């Protein structure tokens, strides 16, 4: 029975929830490596069923982790605001605990307006604003209203009656601190709702059009007050008084003359035939260059009738067949190895004898 190599065993389903995303991806790569080894899977008794199951579970776990991370990224700003609110509420609770654990002398003094309990609440609010790091005008107004209500409450109670025991003195700061915590939490909720309502979604084209309009207005205002730059003045002067362009130097071109141009303009006024223009162009080419076309060896193309074209084709075909016959005879003679030599039936001796005899005759004639 074959066993999986070390490190490639499929993980139990309960272990996948405790694994991180990096570990899950590493395990998925290992399972893919095992699935690619077809020979190894064929040797297994279950034909790799467990490996396929673990592969599917790993894929599902990775998809779930990615979905959770994506949702957490979407709700990240909301969670930050919630954490800040929880931190503020915790600071208020700490302030209440300190107020409860304080001495009865401080509790009785809290009944007088502007006492230490109210100061403690103010200090907790200031520390809370510093921890948030972004105080706003609305938050300051709400906190001032809360302080006003807290200060007003004990003053009215002092005018009506004074508590006879320390129980009443403990009851009032608790009530004030709890109302303070509720007011601060409601103020944070209102701030959060206001900020969400201020968020608007606008099209990119509208934003660009607004930016362009603002830039145009700014440029119009600035152009009315500022003077034109120097380079704009130079460009306007150059447009009014343009500089004549110089002709580029070209090879094999006669130098430009004003008289020639004027005479050419005068001549161009009169109509010129196509043959005259062609002759002038040819003469101009002969003047500026020494390269000329060679004379034609054959006559230019002509339009022929059908009968003449048929006769020319037949003649061309006959010439072609004759040429093919000559080539075939030459090749056949080369294959048969036929050699043409001079035929002499008397042989070389007869020729020599005749030559010698002729010489003797010449000698005899010379003797006489």
Swiss-Prot record:
Indicate whether Transcription appears among the record's keywords: yes
Keyword Iron part of the UniProt annotation: no
Domain of life, source organism: Eukaryota
Region Disordered, as annotated, extends over 116-186, 203-227, 255-282, 339-368
- List, alphabetically, the InterPro entries matched: GRINL1, Tuftelin_GRINL1A/MYZAP/CCD68
Q: Which GO terms describe its cellular component?
A: I band; neuronal cell body; nuclear envelope; RNA polymerase II, core complex; transcription preinitiation complex
Query: Quick one: effect of changing residue 33 to D?
Result: Markedly reduces the interaction with Pol II
A GO biological process of this protein is: maintenance of ER location
Entry's Pfam families? GCOM2 (PF15328)
Q: What modifications does the entry list under PTM / processing?
A: Dephosphorylated at Ser-270 by the PNUTS-PP1 complex, promoting RNA polymerase II transcription pause-release.
Could you tell me which residues belong to the region Interaction with Pol II? 227-298, 315-340
- List keywords of the entry alphabetically: Coiled coil, DNA-directed RNA polymerase, Nucleus, Phosphoprotein, Transcription
For bias type Polar residues, the affected ranges are 116-131, 205-224, 258-273
| Modified-residue entries (Phosphoserine), positions | 270
Acidic residues composition bias: residue spans: 358-368
Can you tell me which residues the record assigns to a coiled coil? 301-335
Expression by tissue, per the entry, reads:
Detected in adult an fetal brain. Detected in heart, kidney, skeletal muscle, small intestine, lung, prostate and testis.
UniProt GO molecular function: RNA polymerase II complex binding; transcription elongation factor activity
Region span, Important for transcription repressor activity: 29-68, 299-314
Say which family it is in.
Belongs to the GRINL1 family.
Q: What else is known?
A: The adjacent MYZAP and POLR2M genes are part of a complex transcription unit. The respective transcripts derive from different promoters and are alternatively spliced. In human, some transcripts of the upstream promoter of MYZAP use exons of the downstream POLR2M gene.
* Name assigned to this protein: DNA-directed RNA polymerase II subunit GRINL1A
């Amino acid at each position: 029975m074959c066993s999986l190599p070390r490190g490639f065993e499929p993980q139990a389903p309960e272990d996948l929830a405790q694994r991180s995303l990096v570990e899950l991806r590493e395990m998925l790569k290992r399972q893919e490596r095992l699935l690619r080894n077809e020979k190894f899977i064929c040797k297994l008794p279950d034909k790799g069923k467990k490996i396929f199951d673990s592969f599917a579970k790993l894929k599902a776990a990775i998809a779930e982790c990615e979905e959770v991370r994506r949702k957490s990224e979407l709700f990240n700003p909301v969670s930050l605001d919630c954490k800040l609110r929880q931190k503020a509420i915790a600071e208020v609770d700490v302030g209440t605990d300190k107020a409860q654990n304080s001495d009865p002398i401080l509790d009785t003094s809290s009944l007088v307006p502007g006492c230490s309990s109210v100061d403690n609440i103010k200090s907790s609010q200031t520390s809370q604003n510093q921890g948030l790091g972004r105080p706003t005008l609305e938050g300051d107004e709400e906190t001032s209203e809360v302080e006003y209500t807290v200060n007003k409450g004990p003053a009215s109670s002092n005018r009506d009656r004074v508590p006879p025991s320390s129980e009443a003195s403990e009851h009032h700061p608790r009530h004030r601190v709890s109302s303070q915590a509720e007011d601060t939490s409601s103020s944070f909720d209102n701030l959060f709702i206001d900020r969400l309502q201020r968020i608007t979604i606008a099209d990119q084209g509208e934003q660009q059009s607004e930016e362009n309009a603002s830039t145009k207005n700014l440029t119009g205002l600035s152009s009315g007050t500022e003077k034109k730059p120097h380079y704009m003045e130079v460009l306007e002067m150059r447009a009014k008084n343009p500089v004549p362009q110089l002709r580029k130097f070209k090879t094999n071109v006669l130098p430009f003359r004003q008289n020639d141009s004027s005479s050419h303009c005068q001549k161009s006024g009169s109509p010129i035939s196509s043959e005259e223009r062609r002759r002038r162009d040819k003469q101009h080419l002969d003047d500026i260059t020494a390269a000329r076309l060679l004379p034609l060896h054959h006559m230019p193309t002509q339009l022929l009738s059908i009968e003449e074209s048929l006769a020319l084709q037949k003649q061309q075909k006959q010439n072609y067949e004759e040429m093919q016959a000559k080539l075939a005879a030459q090749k056949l003679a080369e294959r048969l190895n036929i050699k043409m030599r001079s035929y002499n039936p008397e042989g070389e001796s007869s020729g020599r004898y005749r030559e010698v005899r002729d010489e003797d005759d010449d000698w005899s004639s010379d003797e006489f």
